[in-house]
Design a protein with these regions (language model features):
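Functional-site microenvironments in short loops/helix caps that host divalent-cation chemistry
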Residues: 33-50, 71, 78, 83, ...
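Bacterial N-terminal signal peptides that target proteins for export
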Residues: 4-17
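Short, low-structural-confidence N-terminal segments
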Residues: 47-56, 62-63, 67-70
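Catalytic loop of the DD-peptidase/beta-lactamase superfamily, centered on the K-T-G motif
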Residues: 518, 523-526, 531, 536, ...
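C-terminal motif of bacterial Sec signal peptides marking the signal peptidase cleavage site
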Residues: 26-28
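Sec-dependent N-terminal signal peptides
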Residues: 14-21, 31
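A short glycine-rich, aromatic-capped structural motif
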Residues: 61-154, 167-190, 353, 537-538, ...
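Short, P/G- and charge-enriched loop/turn segments at secondary-structure junctions
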Residues: 57-59, 89-92, 494, 524-529
């Protein structure tokens, strides 16, 4: 009797075990189909099927790090001053901001990097041809910035940009507009190399270009058949581009191989990257604050091996740009080669000293954190692709290229041949929107009509009035070149009260010409975007797409 009872119990125990195993098998089989990345969660259809249908890069892992870049993991930080405002500018009052993760150049753009840009322009758009002469000329740095009435600096005028001795020194004499155009060129050259590497373009395609057949990332993504002036469907196409039945295959945004644009960093990004607060983080709190990009309240190194040496290249005192012969404090009189000093905690070099750097923002004395405390940036001008009479996107050609004349008379190309023409967004994009209402937002809430003391109601926004008396920032407005003084004229009005307008840009950081006060990352200065100097350079940034970091692990310390 006992034996039969035990046998029955054992049999009953087997039933749920078998049912459980069966359930696991069913879940496993069913889970495979439900969790398959090549099966649509919306329709159940197969993705990337040989028969056709929806095609998507389901194997995408992570954004590729572009040449020269370092990943900066985003976060929150106090943007603004952390020391006494001895200059009494009151233009960097502390405000809490958050920036997304992004990439930034490890170093400033060097003379060698910029010379590569000039070489490409000269080969593709020969300056000896009348229609192209202003493309190359407009990109040339102003080497005369080294001149001073009471200084013997002609050696730098003649040699600094082109001599190989200065190859790894930061480029100077570049205005804000030129820095933006270099960034656009760099974007296209990097993506062109990626497409060639991955077989979408011929290996030597990028070496066979001329003024009528250049590569543009924007053109390739939006109207790929017109890339290289239409030659992509012939000798410029790569192995992957030759699809079945003669159909061309192009990389798309969904392919995930093309990088976002190289651009100037925003002021918030630059300051966040320079401060590199991850160096003083423990768990989820900061242990103190940073005055400089390194972990010290002083400009000299406290490390045993380098104790007493300056941590950046800046002016030591009146008439002292580098110390005594044989015992240089900062290893240079003018600029020095990039990577001369140790990097900050993000791995970035020269975020203090050497040269100050252009950032993307239009200058205003106040950061309006009531409107934005996320990815703060003043300077948005929203554009869209121009559409021709045939309903197609307009590609700039050598015959349709347009030039802009800057306030100082310098002529620069607005867009290079091969790029898509753009126009400001209009009411078709802004109608009944609440997040933005205009294309040009540079003076939003600080310089537009609604922010002036003359504003009474919404009807004033469309009214006309004296631009001198109704403007919040009554800045000089030089006449467009073309009349007096050999094509140049000055604003001689005595009514002007400010140098601030929508074409004045922020530059950050100290330089070889500056005292230690300016190497604090929070300090801000500004100049008109057409001005170049011997102490301002730039570096590029790139937005990160996808996850905030490359790993999901939190670390106790930065």
């Amino acid at each position: 009797m006992l034996t039969s009872v035990f046998t029955m119990k054992r049999s009953l125990l087997k039933v749920p075990v078998c049912l459980a195993l069966t359930g696991l098998l069913l879940v496993g089989c069913g889970g495979k189909s439900k969790g398959d990345k090549n099966i649509s969660s919306a329709t159940g259809w197969k993705i990337n099927a040989k028969e056709g249908g929806f095609q998507y890069n389901t194997d995408f892992k992570d954004q590729e790090t572009g040449p020269g870049l370092v990943l900066i993991e985003g976060g929150t930080f106090t943007m603004g001053q952390v020391q006494d405002n001895v200059m009494h500018d009151w233009n960097n009052v502390p405000t809490q901001q958050h920036v997304q993760s992004f990439y930034m150049d490890e170093t400033e753009v060097t003379n060698k990097m910029y010379m590569e840009y000039l070489d490409w322009l000269k080969r593709v758009f020969p300056p000896e041809e009348e229609q192209y002469k202003n493309i190359y000329k407009g990109a040339l740095p102003d080497t005369l910035v080294w001149r001073s009435p009471l200084s013997a600096n002609e050696a730098m005028v003649a040699n600094y940009l082109r001599h190989p001795a200065f190859a790894e020194y930061p480029v100077v004499g570049v205005n804000w507009v030129q820095a933006v155009q270099f960034s656009a060129w760099r974007t296209d050259r990097v993506n062109e190399a990626i497409l060639s590497r991955d077989g979408y373009l011929a290996k030597d395609a990028r070496y066979q270009v001329d003024a009528t057949s250049t590569f543009s990332t924007d053109t390739y993504l939006n109207t790929p058949s017109q890339t290289y002036g239409g030659k992509i469907q012939g000798e410029m196409g790569g192995k992957k581009a030759s699809g079945k039945d003669g159909q061309m295959t192009y990389a798309k945004q969904t392919s995930g191989i093309l990088l976002p644009e190289y651009r100037l960093p925003t002021e918030a990004e630059w300051e966040y990257a320079a401060k590199s607060l991850n160096g003083i983080r423990q768990y989820n709190s900061l242990q103190g604050r940073k005055k400089y990009p390194w972990n010290s309240q002083y400009t000299r190194s406290t490390e045993r091996r380098t104790r007493g040496e300056q941590m950046a290249n800046f002016k030591q005192g009146k008439g002292d740009y580098g110390g005594l012969a044989g015992w240089s404090d900062d290893k240079g009189d003018i600029t020095v080669a990039v990577k001369t000093y140790p990097p900050n905690d993000f791995g970035l070099y020269d975020m203090a000293g050497n040269v100050a750097e252009w950032v993307a923002d239009v200058y205003r004395p106040i950061l309006d954190d009531e409107v934005s405390d996320f990815n703060y940036y003043r300077g948005n001008v929203y554009m869209k692709h121009a559409i021709g009479e045939d309903g197609k996107q307009v590609v700039v050609t050598p015959e349709t290229i347009k030039y802009d004349t800057l306030s100082n008379g310098k002529i620069v190309a607005r867009n290079l041949p091969g790029n898509l023409a753009t126009v400001p967004v209009d009411s078709s994009e802004t109608y009944l929107r609440y997040n933005f209402t205009h294309s040009d937002n540079r003076s939003y809430n600080d310089g537009d009509k609604a922010s002036t003391r003359k504003f009474r109601n919404q009807n004033d926004l469309g009214s006309s009035g004296s631009e001198y008396t109704n403007s919040m920032y009554n800045a000089p407005k030089p006449k467009k070149p073309g009349t007096e003084l050999n094509g140049k004229d000055y604003d001689t009005s005595n009514d002007r009260t400010s140098l601030i307008d929508d074409e004045v840009r922020v530059f950050k950081g100290g330089s070889w010409r500056d005292r230690a006060f300016w190497i604090d990352p929070a300090q801000r200065r500004y100049l008109p975007q057409y001005i170049a100097t011997d102490y301002i350079g730039f570096r590029n940034a790139m937005s990160r797409v996808g996850s905030k970091s490359k790993t999901n692990h939190r670390t106790p310390r930065g």
